[in-house]
Amino acid sequence: MNKSINNLQDIFLNNARKERIPVTIFLVNGVQLKGIVKGFDSFTVVLDSDGKQQLVYKHAISTVSPAKPILFNSAQVFDN
């Protein structure tokens, strides 16, 4: 893949974090976690839920569903 293309996953999580959009994270075992994304790296997502932090490993995540649409444009996906 071309290095000028940014990681869509990172753009999505970063916008959710910056805009403080509540998300529901569905794990592969069916558990639902709700909260605000506080941070993330290549392997984990930190979720704040009612003042409690949870470190969730990305390999355990099935789906991330935001409470409202996360807007981004092609300029965030492609470097010019």
Curated annotation (Swiss-Prot):
InterPro entries documented for this protein: Hfq, LSM_dom_sf, Sm
Gene3D superfamilies named in the record: 2.30.30.100
Listed GO CC annotations: cytosol
GO biological process: regulation of DNA-templated transcription; regulation of RNA stability; regulation of translation, ncRNA-mediated
KW RNA-binding (keyword) present: yes
Record keywords, A-Z: RNA-binding, Stress response
NCBIfam families tied to this protein: Hfq, PRK00395.1
Function: RNA chaperone that binds small regulatory RNA (sRNAs) and mRNAs to facilitate mRNA translational regulation in response to envelope stress, environmental stress and changes in metabolite concentrations. Also binds with high specificity to tRNAs.
Subunit structure: Homohexamer.
Protein name stated in the entry: RNA-binding protein Hfq
Record organism: Clostridium perfringens (strain SM101 / Type A)
Taxon lineage: Bacteria, Bacillati, Bacillota, Clostridia, Eubacteriales
Gene: hfq
